A protein has these predicted regions:
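A short glycine-rich, Lys/Arg-flanked "PGG" loop and its adjoining helix->strand segment in the class I
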Residues: 69-84, 99
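A short hydrophobic/small-residue beta-strand
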Residues: 14-15, 85-86, 109
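Conserved short alpha-helix immediately C-terminal to the canonical SAM/SAH-binding motif I
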Residues: 23-27, 67, 94
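Hydrophobic beta-strand segment of the Class I
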Residues: 58-61
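Residue-level signal for inorganic ion chemistry
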Residues: 28, 64, 102
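Core SAM-dependent methyltransferase catalytic element
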Residues: 107-125
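Short strand-turn motif at the edge of the Rossmann-like AdoMet-binding core
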Residues: 87-92
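Conserved SAM/SAH cofactor-binding pocket of Class I
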Residues: 1-48, 52
């Protein structure tokens, strides 16, 4: 949703936006129209990156750690070499769990930021 709009407005050539929630998909499509980004953002209802074959330079996700852990393998598979996986929505108590899974998969942790009880991680393939 908002991450795809922001990515496009910040210069991404094309954005593929996936969400499981039908309401979120409809909202993203409406916001895409409001921001005149129809040709720049493809919006689909999907369960994380399951069965997605599209490669990306950057994958951005703002979801809870438990769901993020399920996404890491597919994120690796869908990133080009040296691509970035930017995650947020991780509660501090789950930070090490997520970071360890990223490292185990082969990601290099580039940056970690914490604000209050929330963590974001930038990892590179």
């Amino acid at each position: 949703g908002i991450l795809s709009i922001a990515s496009s407005l910040l210069g991404a050539k094309h954005v593929y936006s996936y969400d499981l929630d039908e309401v979120a998909v409809k909202s993203t499509k409406a916001n895409r129209e409001l921001n005149n980004l129809t040709g720049k953002i493809t919006v689909s209802q999907n369960d994380l990156l399951k069965n997605v074959q599209q490669k990306a330079n950057v994958i951005v996700s703002n979801i809870l750690a438990e769901i993020l852990l399920l996404l890491i393998d597919d994120a690796w598979d869908n990133l080009y070499d040296n691509g970035y996986f930017i995650t947020s929505g991780i509660i501090t108590s789950k930070h090490n769990l997520v970071e360890d899974k990223l490292k185990d998969k082969g990601f290099k942790i580039i940056e970690t930021k914490t604000k209050d009880d929330w963590v974001s991680i930038v990892a590179q393939k």
